[in-house]
């Protein structure tokens, strides 16, 4: 994720020495508490029952950029050693790309040199770094009262009813503010798990107290930057803001949010627009939804091609798979949104500092 | 749109001297025919009946980067003078931001210095430059047989049934390959127009003959780059690839596309994934859908705030508005997709040139 | 010149329709006076006697990004139409690259598609755009009291003695604060002119009131960014800061500038370091020197190769050449320095806005 | 160093856990031999007698991006753990910035949060990462026969006579191809060392077999990109190409290099231009010179300011300092040049792959 003033680069492979992140542009003076960072990483493990059995402690090692408990302003590098990787299995399926996975296009892209073990650099394990980036970004946003929270909006056929931002931020349930919907989501995931299958879902992410004026037209469009960040998360196949695709079915008179005065400030009566108009934040809550496809690794037999012999074969995967990755995606989605917001906030401060 | 090797910057304002584009990174030797470029620009005007009455000839003036009918390899600048702008009206509504428009957040973003006339730099008129960028990108892609085409997938409640890529590229109808659906779309737009309202829709864009291996994980993700480009188009509120949001309702066993051998090459039996896995093209047709909200400018009365007096007022817009911008968005969507593909193709060629 | 928050792109060819510039990232609210801009452009014409006889009015046409006399915050495009170009001559020398010019490598780089007339995109005429960029950057810097001024430090064997910043900024002579040296420089240029030759020189540029803290180590190094900008000016072959190459001959004990307290602030007693330590400004005047090679276009006969026949031939140039480009380089050097400083100042403001 | 297709970011602090590098854009299939990499790192230690007594084994740990002995095409991270750091001393001088060092401006830049121990992120130790980047870049260049070599051109008053590229590449002396000059350089460094002082110098770097056509005008200028990279090396205060600053004293008729035919190819008779004209390589050897100031850390007493009490004090440094860093700069200079060349080579291949 390369912002103008804030960017990060993920490194590492699922079965290599480590995974990690290098963050550039973090301002100095952000307080860093490893326990807090670990708590965020813990969220990334999702609901144990529906997650891969690979369970590592994910101990973040801060290699650079933090001194005496605060960011220094120079590049921050954090890595997490890999410990519990079992690569033996991947040699078996090296020539039989898994449907729905990057195996085949990656082989083409990297001329066969890529580390194919456990998905290599494509592995969901790389999101460890994303969550760490989010940790720093959230700390920066907190200074301005900006908060970001994601919840599961859908698992397969089960959709959570629309919730108001206040409800969401007040909810004690870390996955979904609607307990009833959450129960049914769990059932859906369980059904998928039991049948050796997987299931998709959507995540809704909300950011509050975002000031108006972040973003801009064309190259500065904050929706475009957010979408760009969110699509980089593995398995994401759709992103929408506000009413998103539902706008396509509407008339302008229904879709437009009237401007009103609330507590002496400009606001909109409804928030169909999801907090962004013309690529710029309006001061209303930012609302986006992200579609995740079902994990492609499933236990059911699938058809694929043996790339050496160029014939079609049946593939039966063994290993430790998530039956649903949506619960573990929550902190990852939040991290991407927080990071983009932090970049745009910094850009805003640059202008505020010179426009008189 | 800033790619790694290919980027463009739009400039101009709706009621300023001109709108235009500067393109960097175009390789030398692309043949440029102004008539072809104009034909593309003509498509951008959409269906006359449902488009703004502002009708300009959109004569592209190539200012730099083209010599003897070919690109030179240095920055290409093309501009189109504005002629038919009527700004008188905009002074009236200067302090009453139009609902659904960028007026209010733009005023915050630009500290009140933005050119508010006709939407200024936010105007749909700026897409003139996008279409010009697309013209060059398509010419480059053509050398490799890559073709990009967009069609209207939905207008309000009317959805075009799924079409196969071959059908689409063979269709004589420039808006929608399904004549029956198109008829009903026209009716829908007419209804909106007559009631002084506007209507939204979706565009589906397909690219064929895209080689496998473009894109990459994380920072090189081609879906992210495409989404980033598409969200920069005004009024876009959602982007999805392949089955997109429908993936969220599915099981992995339904969603995964089996790999097969077709004509001695690796392909997938179905194309749920829309041509990209793990951020990398698979060689299958690239398929994306883009949601457009209804044009916010409507003739029906709306509520807004007078920013000077900070009280709520009724707003009745006069002017020349599109009742539906979806038809004119087609070449814009194609242009964005073509441009991103061209950037990734160039990056691919860099690696092909050094990996031995 | 691509900075993080401020960048510009030059476009146009010497004998094409126009030359111009697109500037991105300029904050809104910078007052623009065309007469001031023209005065800067006038400086770029140098001393009439030693400059090309091509004399155009260089009327800047502001195409975008300025509204009601102030920058809007969106991309600023300014162009200057070409009027007095005589291309007939260039067909003659198309296959015989001029020694010291980009003709030959440009032909290779652009696969023969480049506009070779008058140097095309390589022409010194493109510095029109640089000067315009400098105009905006200087206006921004002025708000913070930062001023940039360049003077001729050397023409051939004649060197101006070191001057103090105060002297320089107070000098009425626009080329060199030392009248005696300037007289001898003029003689040197005249001698070169009369013999159908050209002569090189150096420019020293000084910026005062630059706050401490701009720049940073490695990727943020402001000397590197300044050098990068300065080397983009045609004919520049060397850049140095402070004592520059003289440091190589020195001992640390001579070279180090002692820190002292001046008016209650930290300063250095001497300014050998030229205002930058470790890539960061110290608050002392920024001092850089730039070496310009003699204009390669001379009237004396030269040897070159006929690229078609691949044999060696004599080349006698006709045309209108500068006998010395150093005088006209002054506003160009200032512009590059001002632009880089403005970019770093913006970045600084971003951090100042969030570090608490 | 951020190129268009190839970039690296250094991380770490002198007395932190580690120093290292993350490289993005390296193509897959580059063979990696740790012993070769260590040999390059060994060169970075310079001549033992004149280098800091901190002697670490500099064992590179390849964390990511290399699989089965070849680059994978995903980000390469290499780190070297810090072992022999003694930080106790730095608390003493925390408030008394060392003359010639970044201590003072760094404190301003980072609002006091920077790791000041051993220079922190400004430490020469960070060049470990640069050398590693150079290792990869050189391997890529080797495929095309491109070789880069640097030598000491000057130490204080002692200058090595000009050498031809063939001589340089054939020389067995790793520091200077002229044995006599090298002897005198050693004496000069010894004199500085004995007097508790340090001495500056210049490095000349030469690249051979660079194809014509790399680089371009303005934003693509390869001299600008090289200078930008070279100025990022600590202590560099000047960069010049070909005759560099000597051009300023010359006439065009002396300076211009006649084009000639050599072995059926276009060449120049002389190489005053140093292999680049108009920002583009000409096919002649690339020649640049880099000025290094004397190491600011010396044992002689110096004057500085106590930043807390704001009064002037005498500073006597203790610690382990280089009396001359020029010998250890050689692989660092080579690395920067190789890296920039590799980036431009990749860009060239992109165009070669599409221009027909």
Swiss-Prot record, chains A, B, C, D:
NADP(+) binds at residues 44, 49. One of its GO terms (biological process) is amino acid biosynthetic process. One of its GO terms (molecular function) is FMN binding. Pathway: Metabolic intermediate biosynthesis; chorismate biosynthesis; chorismate from D-erythrose 4-phosphate and phosphoenolpyruvate: step 7/7. FMN binds at residues 121-123, 278, 293-297, 320. Its cofactor is FMNH2. GO terms for cellular component: cytosol. Its EC number is 4.2.3.5. Reduced FMN (FMNH(2)). It is an enzyme of class 4 (lyase). Keywords: Amino-acid biosynthesis, Aromatic amino acid biosynthesis, FAD, Flavoprotein, FMN, Lyase, NADP. InterPro entries: Chorismate_synth (IPR000453), Chorismate_synth_AroC_sf (IPR035904), Chorismate_synthase_CS (IPR020541). It comes from the Archaea. It catalyses: 5-O-(1-carboxyvinyl)-3-phosphoshikimate = chorismate + phosphate. PANTHER family: CHORISMATE SYNTHASE. Belongs to the chorismate synthase family. This reaction introduces a second double bond into the aromatic ring system. NCBIfam families: aroC, PRK05382.1. This is Chorismate synthase. It comes from Thermococcus gammatolerans (strain DSM 15229 / JCM 11827 / EJ3).
């Amino acid at each position: 994720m390369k912002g103008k003033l804030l960017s990060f680069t993920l490194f590492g492979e699922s079965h290599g020495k480590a995974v990690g992140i290098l963050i550039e542009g973090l301002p100095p003076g952000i307080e860093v508490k490893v326990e807090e960072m670990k708590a965020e990483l813990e969220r990334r493990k999702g609901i144990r029952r529906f997650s891969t059995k690979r369970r590592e402690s994910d101990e973040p090692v801060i290699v650079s950029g933090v001194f005496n408990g605060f960011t220094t302003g120079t590049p921050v590098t954090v890595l997490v050693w890999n410990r519990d990787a079992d690569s033996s299995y991947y040699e078996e399926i090296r020539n039989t790309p898994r449907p729905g996975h990057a195996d085949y296009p990656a082989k083409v892209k990297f001329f066969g040199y890529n580390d194919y073990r456990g998905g290599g650099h494509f592995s969901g394990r790389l999101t460890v770094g994303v969550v760490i980036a989010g940790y720093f970004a959230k700390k920066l946003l907190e200074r301005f009262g900006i908060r970001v929270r994601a919840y599961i909006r859908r698992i397969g056929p089960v959709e959570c009813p629309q919730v108001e931002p206040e409800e969401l931020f007040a909810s004690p349930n870390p996955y979904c503010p609607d307990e009833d919907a959450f129960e049914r989501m769990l059932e859906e995931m369980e059904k998928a798990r039991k049948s050796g299958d997987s299931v998709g879902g959507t995540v809704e992410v909300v950011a509050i107290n975002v000031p108006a004026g972040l973003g801009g037209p064309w190259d500065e469009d904050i929706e475009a930057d957010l979408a760009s960040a969110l699509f980089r998360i593995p398995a994401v196949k759709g992103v929408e803001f506000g009413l998103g695709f539902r706008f396509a079915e509407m008339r302008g008179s229904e879709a437009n949010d009237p401007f009103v005065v609330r507590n002496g400030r400009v606001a909109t009566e409804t928030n169909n627009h999801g907090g962004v108009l013309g690529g710029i934040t309006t001061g209303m809550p930012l609302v986006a939804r992200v579609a995740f496809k079902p994990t492609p690794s499933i236990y059911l037999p699938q058809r694929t091609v043996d790339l050496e012999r160029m014939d079609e074969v049946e593939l039966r995967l063994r290993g430790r798979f998530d039956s649903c990755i949506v619960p573990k995606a929550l902190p990852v989605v939040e991290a991407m949104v927080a990071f983009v917001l932090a970049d745009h906030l910094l850009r805003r401060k640059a202008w505020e500092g010179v426009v008189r």
